[in-house]
C-alpha cells in the first residue's frame, strides 16, 4: 500500500525532534508504548544537516563471516538491493540493520555508498553499524 506525505506534514515533521513525535503518538494512542528504543548513544554524522524525514527503505547487512552463496546469487541480491533503494517516490530514509551488532566490522556507509544513496534521492541513513570516510 502506497502512502503519501503531504508537504505540510513533511515540513511539520522536519521542525520537531524524534521524542516529540513519539510523545504525540503516545498521546494519540492513549497509552505509553515505545519500549523498543535505542538505549545507546546515537551519533549524527551531519549535525548541521537538519532532520531526516521520510519513509523507511529497510535492509540488513553482515560482514563478520564470508558469504557462502554462489557469486551470481550475491550479485543478483546486491542489484536487487540497489533497485529497491532507487525506487524512491517520495521522501525516504535508508534504515540498515547490521546483524553483526555489536561486533560490526563492515563499514557499509562510506563515501561511495553515501553518494550512491544520495543519488537515489534518499534523505539520509540510519544504522546500528559503522561508517567511515564520509567527508
Task: Identify the role of each PLM range.
Residues 83-128:
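Extracellular/luminal Protease-associated
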Residues 5-80:
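N-terminal low-complexity or amphipathic/hydrophobic leaders
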Residues 132-135:
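Histidine/lysine/aspartate-rich catalytic loop segments that bind and position anionic ligands
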Residues 17-24, 55, 109, 113, ...:
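General structural feature for long, well-ordered alpha-helical segments within catalytic domains
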Amino acid at each position: 500500500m502506497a502512502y503519501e506525505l503531504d508537504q505540510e506534514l513533511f515540513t511539520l515533521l522536519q521542525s520537531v525532534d524524534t521524542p516529540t513525535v513519539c510523545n504525540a503518538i503516545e498521546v494519540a494512542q492513549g497509552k505509553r508504548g515505545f519500549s523498543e528504543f535505542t538505549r545507546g548513544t546515537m551519533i549524527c554524522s551531519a549535525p548541521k544537516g537538519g532532520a531526516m524525514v521520510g519513509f523507511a527503505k529497510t535492509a540488513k547487512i553482515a560482514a563478520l563471516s564470508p558469504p557462502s552463496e554462489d557469486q551470481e546469487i550475491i550479485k543478483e541480491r546486491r542489484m536487487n538491493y540497489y533497485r529497491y533503494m532507487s525506487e524512491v517516490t517520495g521522501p525516504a530514509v535508508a534504515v540498515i540493520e547490521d546483524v553483526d551488532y555489536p561486533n560490526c566490522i563492515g563499514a557499509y556507509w562510506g563515501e561511495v555508498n553515501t553518494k550512491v544513496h544520495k543519488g537515489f534521492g534518499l534523505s539520509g541513513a540510519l544504522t546500528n553499524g559503522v561508517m567511515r570516510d564520509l567527508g
